[in-house]
Design a protein with these regions (language model features):
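Membrane-interface helix-boundary motifs at transmembrane edges
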Residues: 74, 78-82, 154-164
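Hydrophobic alpha-helical transmembrane segments of multi-pass membrane transport/permease proteins
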Residues: 16-37, 50-61, 167-180
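Hydrophobic cores of alpha-helical transmembrane segments in multi-pass inner/ER membrane proteins
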Residues: 56-68, 98, 142-149, 217-228
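Helix-loop-helix units of permease transmembrane domains in multi-pass membrane transporters
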Residues: 7, 66-92
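Terminal transmembrane helical anchor/hairpin motif
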Residues: 36, 104-138, 159-242
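Aromatic- and glycine-rich beta-strand/loop motifs that create alpha-glucan
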Residues: 1-19
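Secretory targeting signals
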Residues: 32-54, 90-160
Length: 245
């Protein structure tokens, strides 16, 4: 199996999954609210978020695909580096297509197509200010972040076993406690410094939010997640019961 064949297989699987997702979202995120409006006397506008569910879907899809695809690709002669590239490129393609599809869907419902109902993307609108291409770029990067987290979590879950996995998870859980302790012990200057770092990372200024710092921050996290996933995937083995192949 070559790279193009593996990528085509992966993209077809993901696009089909995306179509299923949109079917469920149309039912629960669009149809149900519309039915509620028909039987309601309330004239307020009903808003359905289109960003968070898509981010969750992307992470879950990436997580689930790691194990099944790895076994299939290894058995068909692909190297671990090629498998990593297939996952990265397919996630990028799905993020690009998925973000565009959601934005088009939002545009359809943003006018007077259906009164008192709209699809929202408040998190993105804070930064993009209605700019379509900036919204597309930011949504794409957010989906890449979710996909990279799912990829890293999937590889970690398959690569690390037993006590090691528990220790790593506990260390991750301790990070907020550690940061909170540092902020308290450091006093007001430390808290202000940490707040300033956070504001810089998310692009908050006195005039409002700017998108470039946030894009850089998310891109860095995507790079870190992908780097860790590659390192974990480098010596990964196929597990059959308790045996390793």
């Amino acid at each position: 199996m070559k790279f193009k064949t593996a990528l085509r297989y992966r993209v077809i699987y993901q696009v089909r999954s995306l179509a299923i997702y949109f079917g469920f979202y149309a039912l629960f995120g669009i149809l149900f609210p519309l039915i509620g409006l028909l039987f309601s006397n309330d004239v307020n506008t009903v808003s359905s978020d289109a960003v968070i569910p898509c981010l969750v879907f992307m992470g879950i899809l990436s997580f689930l695909g790691v194990n099944t695809d790895f076994k299939l690709f290894i058995q068909n002669g692909l190297s671990r580096w090629t498998i990593f590239l297939v996952n990265f490129v397919s996630n990028a393609i799905l993020s690009l297509v998925g973000s565009l599809a959601v934005l088009v869907l939002i545009k359809v419902f943003s006018g007077n197509f259906i009164s008192h109902f709209q699809l929202s993307m408040k998190l993105i609108d804070v930064y993009a200010q209605g700019n379509f291409f900036m919204s597309w770029l930011l949504f794409f990067i957010l989906l890449m972040l979710s996909g990279s987290l799912g990829l890293l979590a999937g590889v970690f879950n398959d690569r690390i076993d037993g006590v090691k996995k528990l220790i790593v998870l506990l260390l991750l859980l301790m990070i907020p406690i550690l940061l909170g302790t540092i902020a308290q012990l450091g006093g007001a200057p430390m808290r202000l410094r940490m707040l300033h770092i956070l504001q810089t990372m998310v692009g908050y200024q006195s005039t409002g939010f700017t998108v470039l710092p946030l894009l850089l921050t998310i891109s860095c996290f995507v790079g870190i997640n992908l780097g860790l996933a590659y390192l974990l995937n480098k010596h990964r083995e196929i597990k059959i019961g308790r045996a390793h192949v």
